Amino acid sequence: EAAVDRLAMLYQQATNALRSALKQYLKDRTPPSAAHCAFRYPELRLTYHCQGEVPSSVRAYAKVQVPGTYAVTVTQPDAFRTYLLDQLRPLMSDFTVTVEVGPSQANIPYPYVVEQGDELGASGVTAAELARVFPSTDLSAANDGTADGLYDWEDQDPLPLALFDAARTDFSLRRLVHYTGSDWRHVQPWILLTNYHRYVDQFIRHGLNMLQADSRFLQGNSPSEGITLVNIGVGPSNAKNITDHLAVLRPHCWLMIGHCGGLRQSQTIGDYVLAHAYMRRDGILDRVLPPNIP
């Protein structure tokens, strides 16, 4: 917990300093001094000193494969606190590791600390001018190289500690706000994806019934463990875009219900149904998944 607490403290200090400097610049065009422009993401660094131990757990998460140093930049550590603790506790318990927390070399882009864009629009300062004074968004840094395995284990130092670093996460969090019109924190850890309007309508009706005053659902469930329903009937490219952004939230599970999720009139529950896999001709995933895989 001390490591996560320090991540939160460093992140808060950096974002507060960036907001303060940005506010001052909008007021009187005073740029931040060199001593006050270290607006950096915190970094979580873990060194694995292999002592020959063989962890008994067969879990697919919270484990390291080879001795060495692993690192990742972190954003919004308070919001991701539970996730971070769930990963770090078993790592520190089952492996001989050293955990360090400190500022990284990656700057926080100024758009990621501005909650409302109106204050920028009313200031008369252009985005191009702000980008010359403050760290700005670098889309080349927000990539899926780690998640897609597009890196060399032998030459990478440090090794990636997580699938998504701070730049990639912040980019997707802002996209979720843009696409949904609501806070990204509203997305629940259980996600249901579908491209059929009738499924959406049915789940909405079911959800409204569950929210009735006398519902057993409300009596036995925590408000933080809900379901988010996403209609992805917007084409394969947009559907991939949606899931790319949702992935940084590290949901417990997501499930897609397409055409094969429904029963025909001639079928009953218990019948064996073979789902059809389509041969991909859209080219959306060809870069990360061989085209011969359905």
Language-model segments: residues:
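Accessory terminal and edge-of-domain segments that mediate assembly/interaction
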Residues: 1-253, 262-294
